[in-house]
């Protein structure tokens, strides 16, 4: 069983953040925040305009994307936590050369 999003919806699997700091301190689950980066695992067909034309989505399966902390709806499928959000809630696509982003304090 899999999930097929409708219209402009995108299914994202969160990419887990590093659990250890640069100095070697382990961050417990209770203190860590949910990651705001993930990989697109499924997309809908696109957004339908008022005149009936369909606009395809910009993101595709396999893209690494950034999204807001409170974006989308969390769902569980086969014990795995996934995020379903609208394409407009995606802030950007992480290009291959930028894949290792560092959080600025």
UniProtKB/Swiss-Prot annotation:
It is found in: Cytoplasm. Pfam families: Cpn10 (PF00166). InterPro entries: Chaperonin_GroES, Chaperonin_GroES_sf, Chaprnonin_Cpn10_CS, GroES-like_sf. SUPFAM superfamilies: GroES-like (SSF50129). Keywords: Chaperone, Cytoplasm. Its main location: cytoplasm. GO terms for cellular component: cytoplasm. GO terms for molecular function: ATP binding; metal ion binding; protein folding chaperone; protein-folding chaperone binding; unfolded protein binding. GO terms for biological process: chaperone cofactor-dependent protein refolding. SMART domains: Cpn10. Together with the chaperonin GroEL, plays an essential role in assisting protein folding. The GroEL-GroES system forms a nano-cage that allows encapsulation of the non-native substrate proteins and provides a physical environment optimized to promote and accelerate protein folding. GroES binds to the apical surface of the GroEL ring, thereby capping the opening of the GroEL channel. Heptamer of 7 subunits arranged in a ring. Interacts with the chaperonin GroEL. HAMAP family: CH10. Belongs to the GroES chaperonin family. PANTHER family: 10 KDA HEAT SHOCK PROTEIN, CO-CHAPERONIN GROES. This is Co-chaperonin GroES. It comes from Methylovorus sp. (strain SS1 / DSM 11726). The gene is groES.
């Amino acid at each position: 069983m899999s999930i097929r999003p409708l219209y402009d919806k995108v299914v994202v699997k969160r990419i887990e953040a590093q659990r250890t700091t640069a100095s070697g301190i382990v961050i417990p689950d209770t203190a860590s925040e949910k990651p705001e980066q993930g990989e697109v695992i499924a997309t809908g067909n696109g957004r339908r305009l008022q005149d009936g034309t369909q606009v395809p989505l910009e993101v595709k399966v396999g893209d690494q994307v950034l999204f807001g902390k409170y974006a989308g709806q969390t769902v569980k499928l086969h014990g795995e936590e996934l995020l379903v959000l609208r394409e407009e809630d995606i802030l950007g696509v992480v290009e291959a050369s930028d894949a290792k982003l560092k959080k600025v304090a």
